[in-house]
Structures are given as C-alpha cells and as structure tokens.
Swiss-Prot record:
Organism ancestry: Eukaryota, Fungi, Dikarya, Ascomycota, Pezizomycotina
Gene Ontology MF terms: heme binding; iron ion binding; monooxygenase activity; oxidoreductase activity, acting on paired donors, with incorporation or reduction of molecular oxygen
Metal-binding listed as a keyword: yes
Annotated protein name in UniProt: Cytochrome P450 monooxygenase ausI
Topology in the lipid bilayer: Single-pass membrane protein
Annotated organism of origin: Emericella nidulans (strain FGSC A4 / ATCC 38163 / CBS 112.46 / NRRL 194 / M139)
InterPro entries from the UniProt entry: Cyt_P450, Cyt_P450_CS, Cyt_P450_E_grp-IV, Cyt_P450_sf
Note: In A.calidoustus, the austinoid gene cluster lies on a contiguous DNA region, while clusters from E.nidulans and P.brasilianum are split in their respective genomes. Genetic rearrangements provoked variability among the clusters and E.nidulans produces the least number of austionoid derivatives with the end products austinol and dehydroaustinol, while P.brasilianum can produce until acetoxydehydroaustin, and A.calidoustus produces the highest number of identified derivatives.
UniProt-listed Enzyme Commission number(s): 1.-.-.-
Gene: ausI
C-alpha cells in the first residue's frame, strides 16, 4: 500500500528514482573505494550482491580467526581481507623486522582507524601528530624515569583498592572478575591520572561506553559512520561521558595545582609529564590524559583477568607464585629490583600473552611504502602483522598448551635472560608489539600487573565458580579479549607476610 501511495503522488516517481540513484551511488562509491592493494588475493569479499558489504563485515566480526588462518594457509605471506574497517592487508610475522622502525608505518593512525578516532566522542582514540609525540615521549621518558619512585605508592594504592573493591567477608564469595578488576586498577593507578574520587567509576564507564559505541558503529558501512554516529544511542552516550570527563579532569587539575603550590612536592602524574614532553607546543591535556588512561586501562585489565582465570584453575601455580612473592618481598621489599626477581610471575604473564594475545600488531601507512619484496603499501592503507608464530610448534613446543613455566625455563638458557622477559618484544612474541614502536608503557604495565597479582595472591584464594573452566577469553573480529563477565569464587585468607 505504501508503495502504491508513493507512486500515485506527484512526487512519487521522483522519490523512487532518487532512492534508486542514491543507492546506486553509495554502492559504487563503497565498492570503488575499497581497492584491492597490489592485486593481492582478496578474502571475505561479499561480491556484487552484498550491498555495502554488510554480510562480509559481519562474517569477519563473527569468524575472523578462521578467516585469517585460511588466508595464511592459502597464501602464506600476505593477502587482503575485507574487515570492519574496509580492506586491510594481513602479513606474516616475517615482515615484522621491516615494520619495526619504518617511519611511514604508524601505530596511532591505526588505532584511530580501528576506533573511529576522527569522530566526535571518540577523541581518546584519535591520532594527532603533536599529541602522539607528546604521549610517546611522556611515557618513554618521564614515566620511565619516575617508575622507581612510583613502585611504593602504587603498591600502597593498589593494596587499598583491593581492600575497598574485593570481598572482605569470610568464606567463598562469588564475583564477576572483570568488574572487580576494572575498578581495582582504576582506583589503584589513579594517582598518575586523576585524584578526583569520581575517577575510578568514570574511567570504567568510559572504557565500557567506548567499546560499545565502537562495536555498534563498526557494524555500519564505513562511508555511513560519520552520519550514523550522530544518532546511535551508544555514540551519544559516549559523547555524554566524554563531556563529563572533561569537567572531572578540569576540577582535578585545579586541585593538583593548589596541592603542588602548598606542598612543593615533585608531581608524579601525566599532567606534569605532558608539560615537560610538549616543549612548549600546544596540546589538549584533557584528551591526552584520557587517551593514555584508556590505553592503559584496557591492557592492564585484559592481562590481569586472563591470568587470574588461569590461576583459578591451577592451585599448584598459585602455590609456586606465593612462595616466590614471599621470598622476593622479604629480600627486596617493594622495589624495581623486587619486580625483576619475580621471574615465575613474569613468565606466567608472558605465557598468557602468548596463548591469548590481545590483538595483532597494526600500522597505517602515512605515505606510500615499498618493502624489500616489492610489496607496496599505499598511503592510508592499514596492515596487520600476524602473531601466529606465537602458536608455532617450531618456535614453542606444545604451543597449544598453557605452560606458565615456559619463559622461566628459557631465561635460564644462555643468551635468553633478556629476550624471555615479559617486557621484551621479539619477532616471535609480538604481545607488546615490536621494534621502536613497541608499547612504550609496557614497563609501567608490568609493574602494575605484578604488584596487583602479589596483593591478590597473598590475600585471596580463588577458584572457578560452578566448576566452570576454560572460559578465559571471547573473540570479536581479530581481537582475543579477556572474558570480562566470567565469575569466580574468592575467599579472604591470612597472608604469610604483610605486603
């Protein structure tokens, strides 16, 4: 009836014709802009009848690991694939050495492309050259130089956060592990980001809202996202939360300024480190602080939840780690030296990262790039380096098995002491990236993770809820994320030592 009504009105024919023309233009624009780089084989293409490639995108979001594996099984080194951000290149780990320090292959533009950093509300994922430089320098230089001074305050703050956020009742208590860990990390690390008491809840809401908005928007064709973002409820909620974050952090900046003026103490926070790293260049300090906080929160929570779920199923590993914590703490207290000597814990974190990596190493070309084998990466093209050598039997015997002692043993082999450490990226282990653009905050992350796990091990027993095991991760598109909704049972225990 509606079709008949439209066709019988004076404007009916033009409306129908206009709809057909607009649809055709959208179809042609979308399919012509998704070029096939280097005439490489294109996987997961929806074909001419998959309008705006919606079916192909949803297939990638649902079944990316199988699609990527089939690509490397068939084409070995490099291929193109239609994903939820357009057509991307997927390259084998053999390309890692060419990527590691290439000046035209950038990390932040890749993050911005993945998470819509060019759109309002998504600013904490944006890439802006001055801000990118300040962020890297502040982490690589100022944070790294201050890390020794941060260990004791972090240990105290994380211990307090665990007391506040984890159950204090006797007997076994069921918790949603991801929710508790998020709030623990947000509160325990707040001193370097924001001292406002509302910060922990804000940063948890921000991370959740960003994830939901990014996923919801990624379901739409790339060319429509700028328009759709203005109406999607998830995007509007993210925009609202970001606005409240600006207000919260402005309030915190005023408080910090007054506190520093009255005490004269050396500030150990990103607001001050950004100033030092800026060298007088202008930047948005609120957005920059949110960017670093989001990147840190996501990685820290992911790693800690993954290892705690593994520990809940392995009482022997828990016992061995507790012995190590007691021995190291009684000798070194809270210090960088102590964290270095937690070698079994270091190995367990690195093995979690090997078995369940958080994502591929991704780059975007900011200029045309030609690699040694003639592969051309066009400006604006995104490319991901696969980490599948981390599951390679030739590199890691019994690779499918989670062996928390693997890298502990490797560190005892000649020449392996450094490369087998959690914070040491290699072409065979891309958990923190690789080369000069490997995660600059990995030393801070390792410190927070080890301190947090020490507190949990000493203060709590942990086991699976309802006997459920093996549910450590959930996969979405190309990411292998911690199962943040997993439930465990925890019980307060009397620690052998007070830390």
């Amino acid at each position: 009836m509606l079709q008949e009504t439209i066709s019988l009105t004076p404007l009916g024919q033009p409306l129908i014709a206009g709809f057909v023309v607009v649809s055709a233009v959208l179809y042609l624009l979308y399919n012509t802009q998704q070029w096939r780089p280097n005439n490489l084989p294109l996987l997961n293409d929806g074909g001419p009848f998959d309008f705006l490639q919606v079916t192909a995108v949803n297939r990638f979001r649902r079944d990316a690991r199988r699609l990527i594996k089939s690509g490397f099984d068939s084409y070995k080194n490099v291929f193109a694939m239609r994903t939820d951000v357009g057509v991307e290149l997927f390259a084998s780990p053999e390309y890692a050495d060419q990527f590691r320090n290439h000046p035209s292959l950038k990390v932040f533009p890749f993050t911005a492309k993945m998470h819509h950093g060019h759109l309002p509300g998504f600013e904490l994922c944006r890439s802006q050259p001055v801000e990118d430089r300040i962020l890297i320098e502040s982490v690589r230089t100022q944070l790294a130089q201050s890390l020794g001074k941060l260990i004791q305050p972090l240990a105290s703050d994380i211990g307090e956060a665990i007391s506040d956020r984890w159950p204090s009742e006797s007997g076994w208590q069921e918790i949603v592990l991801g929710s508790v860990v998020e709030r623990t990390i947000a509160q325990g690390t707040s001193s370097v980001y924001c001292l406002d008491e509302a910060w922990p809840e804000f940063v948890v809401k921000m991370e959740m809202a960003l994830g939901m908005a990014s996923a919801a928007l990624s379901a739409w064709p790339v060319m429509l996202r700028r328009i759709v973002a203005k109406f999607l409820p998830e995007c509007l909620e993210l925009y609202r939360i970001m606005k409240s974050g600006r207000e919260l952090m402005s309030r915190d900046m005023r408080r910090r300024t007054a506190l520093q003026a009255s005490t004269g103490e050396e500030p150990l926070n990103f607001f001050e480190w950004f100033k030092e790293a800026s060298h007088g260049e202008e930047y948005d300090e609120l957005i920059l602080n949110l960017r670093i906080a989001f990147a840190s929160m996501h990685g820290l929570c992911d790693h800690l939840v993954k290892i705690l779920l593994r520990l809940s199923e392995d009482p022997q590993l828990v016992s061995d780690l507790r012995k190590e914590v007691i021995q190291v703490y009684e000798t070194h207290g809270w210090s960088k030296t102590a964290l270095y000597h937690l070698k079994l814990m270091d190995s367990a974190f690195k093995e979690v990262q090997r078995v369940d990596p958080i994502l591929f190493v991704g780059r975007v070309a900011v200029a045309d790039v030609t690699l040694k084998d003639g592969l051309i990466i066009q400006k604006g093209q995104s490319i991901r380096i696969s980490g599948h050598t981390m599951w390679d039997e030739d590199k890691y015997p019994d690779a499918a098995h989670f062996d928390p002692y693997r890298f502990y043993r490797l560190r005892q082999a000649p020449g392996q002491e450094n490369t087998a450490q959690f914070t040491s990226p290699t072409s065979d282990h891309l958990g923190f990236g690789y080369g000069g653009r490997a995660c600059p905050g990995r030393f801070f992350a390792a410190a927070v993770l080890k301190i947090s796990l020490c507190h949990v091990l000493m203060k709590y027993d942990i086991k699976p809820a309802n006997g459920e095991t093996g549910q450590h991760v959930w996969e979405f598109a190309a990411a292998i994320n911690a199962n943040m909704t997993a439930k465990v049972l925890v019980r307060r225990r009397q620690p052998e030592i007070q830390i």
